[in-house]
């Protein structure tokens, strides 16, 4: 048998009738409409908003406003700008140990990062754990080299 438009039928159970609540007890959802006897949840205009706790001070208002969350796995660096490297001579190697000896870094607690503020007039070999783009460019323009050390 071929199917034509006038013989098409939807599958059984695919089209469900909408429940009409509050239209008499014979309909099965009359009177209290399946919402129970009394109380806020049975009234019109339901439901209550998400997070409503029945008038009790809600959790989002009981908890204090937290600010300044710490960054998880934050990378801390001992930073130094290029203008501090003017004490070094031509062809010197700049690393964390040489900066401590010159007194430019006092406590070498973190890995070294070179920032690009200032000028470099001498040819230096700089060994650090991180460089900014500007710092790396200025060191290489002065004829020096940047060696990237691995972070531990």
Curated annotation (Swiss-Prot):
<comment type="similarity">
    <text>Belongs to the universal ribosomal protein uL15 family.</text>
</comment>
<protein>
    <recommendedName>
        <fullName>Large ribosomal subunit protein uL15</fullName>
    </recommendedName>
</protein>
<keyword id="KW-0694">RNA-binding</keyword>
<dbReference type="GO" id="GO:0003735">
    <property type="term" value="F:structural constituent of ribosome"/>
</dbReference>
<keyword id="KW-0699">rRNA-binding</keyword>
<dbReference type="InterPro" id="IPR001196">
    <property type="entry name" value="Ribosomal_uL15_CS"/>
</dbReference>
<dbReference type="Pfam" id="PF00828">
    <property type="entry name" value="Ribosomal_L27A"/>
</dbReference>
<dbReference type="GO" id="GO:0019843">
    <property type="term" value="F:rRNA binding"/>
</dbReference>
<dbReference type="GO" id="GO:0022625">
    <property type="term" value="C:cytosolic large ribosomal subunit"/>
</dbReference>
<feature type="compositionally biased region" description="Basic residues">
    <location>
        <begin position="14"/>
        <end position="23"/>
    </location>
</feature>
<dbReference type="InterPro" id="IPR036227">
    <property type="entry name" value="Ribosomal_uL15/eL18_sf"/>
</dbReference>
<comment type="function">
    <text>Binds to the 23S rRNA.</text>
</comment>
<keyword id="KW-0689">Ribosomal protein</keyword>
<dbReference type="InterPro" id="IPR005749">
    <property type="entry name" value="Ribosomal_uL15_bac-type"/>
</dbReference>
<comment type="subunit">
    <text>Part of the 50S ribosomal subunit.</text>
</comment>
<dbReference type="InterPro" id="IPR021131">
    <property type="entry name" value="Ribosomal_uL15/eL18"/>
</dbReference>
<keyword id="KW-0687">Ribonucleoprotein</keyword>
<dbReference type="InterPro" id="IPR030878">
    <property type="entry name" value="Ribosomal_uL15"/>
</dbReference>
<feature type="compositionally biased region" description="Gly residues">
    <location>
        <begin position="25"/>
        <end position="37"/>
    </location>
</feature>
<dbReference type="GO" id="GO:0006412">
    <property type="term" value="P:translation"/>
</dbReference>
<feature type="region of interest" description="Disordered">
    <location>
        <begin position="1"/>
        <end position="57"/>
    </location>
</feature>
